[in-house]
């Protein structure tokens, strides 16, 4: 079935659900597409042995709050293929009831040109993240995804047009604060709600400035 393979299918990279996180981390095409964000999002996850066993399908199906994988793939406008329900956006998939009688078979990542940055805050390097942040820019439109809130990752867009005039220190700070106020955070053993809100604004600002510098 090729469920452990990464294939190029027209305008997409098509990943079987059994592709390991380590395979994604080391894949030249995916890293070139994301300017290294793919490797950055995966390299902190526990250890190489674990990443050789953990799969992209399991990471997405669980819709775990701490998922680095889900955070980045939402920013990439990824799609999923389900055996019964067919193809849908990953963002739509995250809204489905968790008790789905279906099977996730493939993940599709669009090849279109975009800028991507991934950042996370961890108490120690291989721990679950305290907060995750993925930013992408395509055709002048910005997408921000915040995960480990500690709930499941959510997508936030520039609804107020704060970045319409370009990214500067001031606009990056304003957008970071806007996302931090719109996002819903909670407390867990790793961090409190207020701490996560503060970190969110910082990661978004840093990510935007890094993206602007690389662009």
Where do the model's predicted regions map?
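C-terminal structural segment of proteins
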Residues: 1-215
